[in-house]
């Protein structure tokens, strides 16, 4: 995620967007990042794997923030519950490549390839927003784009979550939300092989993101969970 956002620093985006230039940059950065990932971090799991990942964000009245992503990987994970805590253990060891000699091979002291991208963004030394998602390899594109909507285009948290996105998390095509305006869709189609992919309840074609944000001016707190998911929710203290 850090590398993907850093690559945007070299791109001058038109004001008032995101316009076609922004989505072209998003698609290029995500495709390059995914290619780098395969070359240096091993193969990823199949996109049809069941989603057993949960992400939560918390902000307290003092502006302290937490972004936490937890995953079981397979349904019920390893099917082992720790007796002292009741926590269900995942079976994330299968993220490793069992074959020796690959970037993601199982070895002592190594961390397996994962998709989780919890992130806290700071502005002027203070936590500004916390964000993350569930949804396998679609997590990074979702978190990346929403973060850019907030950072580069000055959107409100609500507008950023409702804005249509793309997904370039592997494969030969870029998934494009048909709600994107025609100039954006045409520019993407001219540059990359694309496929129209609607935002629906299931499958989660664009991940299941959530975020909390603290307004640095008024100190107000805002939170948004995935607008399509019946499994997302939010709680506020009055």
Language-model regions, residue ranges each:
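Cofactor-centric catalytic regions
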Residues: 179-238
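Proteins synthesized as precursors that undergo proteolytic processing into mature forms
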Residues: 1-37, 51-203
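Short, basic/aromatic recognition patches
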Residues: 43-51
């Amino acid at each position: 995620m850090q590398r993907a956002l850093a690559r945007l620093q070299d791109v001058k985006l038109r004001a008032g967007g995101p316009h076609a230039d922004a989505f072209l940059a998003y698609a290029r950065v995500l495709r390059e990042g995914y290619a780098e990932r395969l070359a240096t971090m091993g193969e990823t799991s199949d996109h049809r794997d069941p989603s057993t990942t949960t992400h939560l964000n918390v902000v307290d009245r003092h502006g302290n923030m937490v972004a936490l992503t937890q995953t079981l990987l397979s349904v019920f994970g390893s099917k082992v519950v720790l007796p002292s805590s009741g926590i269900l253990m995942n079976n994330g060891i299968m993220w490793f490549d069992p074959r020796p000699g690959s970037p993601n091979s199982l070895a002592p002291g190594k961390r397996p390839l994962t998709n989780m991208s919890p992130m806290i963004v700071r502005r002027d030394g203070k936590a500004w927003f916390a964000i993350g998602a569930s949804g396998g390899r679609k997590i990074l594109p979702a978190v990346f784009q929403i973060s850019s909507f907030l950072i580069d285009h000055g959107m409100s948290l609500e507008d950023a979550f409702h804005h249509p996105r793309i997904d370039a998390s592997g494969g030969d095509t870029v998934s494009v939300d048909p709600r994107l305006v025609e100039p954006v869709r045409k520019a993407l189609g001219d540059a990359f092989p694309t496929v129209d992919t609607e935002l629906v309840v299931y499958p989660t074609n664009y991940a299941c993101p959530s975020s909390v944000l603290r307004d640095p001016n008024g100190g107000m707190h805002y939170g948004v969970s995935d607008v399509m998911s019946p499994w997302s929710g939010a709680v506020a203290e009055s």
